[in-house]
Amino acid sequence: GCAGCVISCPHDVIGYDHESGGYKPFHIEDELGPTDCGHGQKGCTSCTRACPRFRVWEPQANEHLFDRDRADDEVAGIYRSGYWDAVHTDILLTRASDDMVHQMGQDGGLVSAILIWAMEQGYIDGALTSYLEGGADSGSWKAIPGVATNRDEILAGAGSRYTYSANTLAYDEAVERGLSRLALVGMSCQSSIPPVMWSRKIGKVSKPILFNIGLLCSKTFDDSIFEELFEAKYG
């Protein structure tokens, strides 16, 4: 799960199982069951309004971001060449010009390069991203959410992840550290949280997220599957 409901809950009654076999939100007050968090009966709908897969979400996100829904021929979505320019332009194949950033990235280091530039220019003061548990040299496959506040921390989070990480869970840490201009790097389910929040009048939570980078994704894996795969292949 994207954890949009977790960071939006004003009553702190939604937790998140970020362990093998989990990766889903849950009610901390589990004795009340899945349909009653104790506050929902009183009219709180923050979690459902923050959920980017609840109700019709794509038109809502498009309306917030571009003031219109996309046309039938806009298969790749709505994109534009400038902030005020709604004219279609080419989709670009890019890579980082900094050799170190390029080498540390998975497919050219573009995301890392954008984050570094945005941070050095003062556009953002932190990024919600992911790291490998125990560090890049630990041999771990498990991805965990974290906050990057400088070039080294951004590069430490570069490269691919083969297990799920709800990067939005790093939001509370960022806010506690006093960061107020954030970038969010996440898969499509996570990157669709901020515009949906604004469209559904729960934008206060997503207000610090000024820069939203969505990564192409067809699926992701629970790290518990690797033990099964290795056992099946190598015995």
Model-identified regions with their sequence ranges:
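Short alpha-helical segments and helix-capping/turn motifs at coil-helix boundaries
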Residues: P10, I28-T35, L110-W117
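Short Fe-S-cluster ligation motifs
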Residues: I28-A50, Y83, M104
